[in-house]
Amino acid sequence: MNSLTDRNFWKEYWNNYVYEKVPQHSEFEAYFPEGMLEGNGRTAIEIGGFPGTMSLYFKRHGYSPTLLDFYIDPSIIEGLEESNGFSKGCVEYIESDFFAFSPAKLYDLVFSIGFIEHFDDTADVIRRHADLVKPGGTLFIALPNFRGLNGLVQRIFDRRNYDAHNINSMIPARLRGMLAAMPLRNVKVAYTRKPMLWLEPRKGAANAVARRAVRLFSYAAKLFPVPSRLMSPYIVISAEKI
């Protein structure tokens, strides 16, 4: 599998990490299939989601979560748990290359946010997600949309981050075609509605200034909440495993 990033990329990326608040609500909730927030002890696995913010979000909603990533710093996970009032170790974590991972079980919910776009073969990455889902379970994937304003912002202010993304993975019609060939039903692929622009945090004053400017522009963009290639920050995929 040809990855657009490597371990050093992510090690440097997480050197800048500041513990964030695990949300009470997710911006993606409007796109979750019915019943997805009712964990009731069901299992979930987050692909490529270190340090596990969304794993903890689903823990809060009653899931037993597992985090799989090929770069994991346990101290960061523990710090995130502690800073958000969770008991230490409530998220199981597995440090492994996704493409070498051999699961001991299947999961009720398999999800990733901002993962599949870092690889050249999008269909293969999605298929491997689907392979981890129990029959009757849920697949949920979100990826950024860099084919509109957000992509322009990344190209101008953070070309390295832009180049770490496969822009061809961000075409809804192509995604629907890939999903149609997999053992899935109730498949939905959609642009999210609420516009949002962002830059990843980097060290240095220039990045801080650029992020403030982009944040102000993002506030203005929210006046146009229309799902579209130009304005939507994300594409979301949901499906049920047959």
Label each PLM-derived region with a short phrase:
Residues 114-118:
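A short His-aromatic
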Residues 48, 136-137:
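Conserved phosphate-binding and hydrolysis motifs of nucleotide-dependent enzymes
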Residues 17-23, 84, 98-99, 120-131, ...:
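S-adenosyl-L-methionine-dependent methyltransferase catalytic module, highlighting the catalytic core
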Residues 1-105, 109, 113, 126, ...:
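Conserved N-terminal segment of class I S-adenosyl-L-methionine
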